[in-house]
Every structure is written in structure tokens, then in C-alpha cells.
Amino acid sequence: MTTTRTITRPDDWHLHLRDGEVLKDTVRDTSRYMGRAVIMPNLVPPVTNTALALAYQARIFAAQPKAGFKPLMTLYLTDNTSADEIKKAKASGQIYAAKLYPAGATTNSESGVTSVEKIKEALQAMQEVGMLLLIHGEVTASDIDIFDREEIFLQKVLAPIVASYPNLKIVLEHITTANAVDFVNNAGDNVAATITAHHLMFNRNHMLVGGIRPHLYCLPILKRNIHQQALIKAATSGAKKFFLGTDSAPHAVNRKEAACGCAGCYTAHAAIELYAEVFEQAGALDKLEAFASFNGPDFYNLPRNSDTITLEKSAWDVPASMSFGNQQVVPIKANEQMLWKVL
């Protein structure tokens, strides 16, 4: 007898769709069963104001194969983001958060924030109007080891922000360490975190042992197994502070398989299926719905989706590559079997 599991339609609380001709592919994959997604603003040029965010949202809507998927837009914080722009974004009703990228931390973050001191007026305005702060939690100093950047960020940057803005809702995105799990668990109810499928499925050995696997290279970088296990424990615990955010971040194959390859894993082709595999292995399939469908909207003060999707325990083969505009993207688990599929 085939095993099935029906859950409330999930959402993706951290997604990169990119822009231009690739939107038809990225929007197709996510909108297949995600009700909503928080859209990252690190385009070129970045989405730094309300007008740019609304124009980007219109392009996403135009790329939808069918109606029903809602992109939740964000602003890209810079040293020059004003309190007035935050208020304007909030008033639009379409912009739900602002994203703090430390300058140079990840893809297209060169225009990011150089010092939290420079965005204090924007943060105060966000606290006043109820706009969420989304954070890429890594320091970028060249003398800091790449595997330590999240841990040091928690101490040096995030802790002071949390202390200075006690009513600001904060999402520490794509957490990768036991340190981040502990920080979020010990913080107030205004602090939460997203966890990606690839940080749950893989650790740095998967990326580096027996040959380097560029399609597992992402930022924040995969960490030790002990950190992977801490993430699995957090995600499958039922704790309301942790929720689904794929950080699905496609790059064309030639940008990944290169002497200096780009950071990012493409998981939107099989997002909920990947999470289901992890939760099943942890003996926690009963906790998947809260993680994928309840905790995110609850934290954002948005209604949960009213419809459902059904997962079936049925193997299928992930293709070697997928269309990405006029190029190709190699998805996570390319040429491998998935154990679950969405009906």
C-alpha cells in the first residue's frame, strides 16, 4: 500500500527567483505547490526601494504559469536606506521585510550594509511600523575563517541588534550552526530562523570528500556534521521558531562548474520532497507540516494557507539538469532518486 501524507500548502520564507528570462523557470518550480514565497532582493541592481520592489513583483506575476502563487517582496538594505523608504514600503502592503546583507557576504551583496550604525534609523522605523528584518548572518572580515563567520556574527552583530531593538521581529536566515540554533532558542519570541533543505541533508564532507562538488557550494557554507545534526534536531523539534526557507539560489551550470564558482544550491525543483526525506529519516514526519506550513505565517502574522498538498512515498529520478532561461541549472540531487513526490 502506498504511503501518502497530506499537509497544509507550504510556503517558502527565503527564495531567490533571479530576474529576466529565467523567471519563467524559477517561478514555475516554486509555484507548483508553494502558496507564497519571500523573494530576496539581491538583483543587479539591487531592489533598494518600493518602486523597484513593486516592479519586480509585477514581473514575477507575469511569469506565473497559473494564478495563485503570491510573492512577498523585500527591500535590500543599504547604508543609505531611509526611515521614509521603510514607511513607504510598509504602506504599499506588498513589502513584508527588509534584508540585511553585510557588504560582500554573498551573491550580489556588494551594495549591502557596511555598519549597523548606518541603518539605525531604518531599523527604528521597521520596529515602529512592524516590518521584519531578515539577516544573512555572517561577518565578512578577511581574517575570519569562512567556517566561523556565522558564530562570530551572532556575538558581534546580532546580539547588539536584538538588544537595541527589542520589538523588532528578526529572522536569522539559513542558519548553519548549533550556535545559531542556541541563539534563536534563547532569544525572545521576536527572533526566529529559517533552515534550508541542503543544510539539513548535507555537511561539508559531502561537498569536499572524494572530490569537490560545486553544486553543494553555498553561503553560508556547509558545516561539520555536529552542526548538521543540531539543525535537524531544531527543524524536527516542533519548535515554532524554526521554519522552511529554501534559499534556493540558481546559477547557470557554467557559473558553478568554474575555477571560481558561484555560491548557491538550486532546490526549488523538489523543495518539500527534500524536507520530507529529512523529516522521515529523523522519525518526525508528523512535525513537517508545522515547519513547512504553520510556523512561517504565524511569525509573519499572516494567515495559514487554507488548501492542502499531498505527498506520496514514491521514487522518481531528478534530472541531470533543468532549463534556466536559455541555459541550464544543475539541481540538488541531480541524477539521483527522490523518495517522495507531490501528487
UniProtKB/Swiss-Prot annotation:
InterPro entries according to UniProt: Amidohydro-rel (IPR006680), DHOdimr (IPR004721), Dihydroorotase_CS (IPR002195), Metal_Hydrolase (IPR032466)
Q: Which PROSITE patterns match?
A: DIHYDROOROTASE_1 (PS00482), DIHYDROOROTASE_2 (PS00483)
Query: What top-tier enzyme class does this entry carry?
Result: hydrolase
For this chain's record, the cofactor binding note is: Binds 2 Zn(2+) ions per subunit.
Entry's Gene Ontology BP terms: 'de novo' pyrimidine nucleobase biosynthetic process; 'de novo' UMP biosynthetic process
Regions that span the bilayer: none
GO MF, one term, reads: zinc ion binding
Return the GO cellular component terms, semicolon-separated.
cytosol
Per UniProt, Zn(2+) 1 binds at H14, H16, K99, D247
Q: Please list the residues that make up the active site.
A: D247
Positions annotated to bind substrate? H16, L17, R18, N42, H136, L219, H251, A263
Q: In which pathway does it act?
A: Pyrimidine metabolism; UMP biosynthesis via de novo pathway; (S)-dihydroorotate from bicarbonate: step 3/3
Q: Give cofactor(s), names only.
A: Zn(2+)
SUPFAM superfamilies registered for this protein in UniProt: Metallo-dependent hydrolases
List the CDD domains hit by this protein, alphabetically.
DHOase (cd01294)
Which positions are annotated as binding Zn(2+) 2?
K99, H136, H174
Subunit note: Homodimer.
Q: So what does this one do?
A: Catalyzes the reversible cyclization of carbamoyl aspartate to dihydroorotate.
Q: What is this protein called?
A: Dihydroorotase
Upper taxonomic lineage: Bacteria, Pseudomonadati, Pseudomonadota, Gammaproteobacteria, Alteromonadales
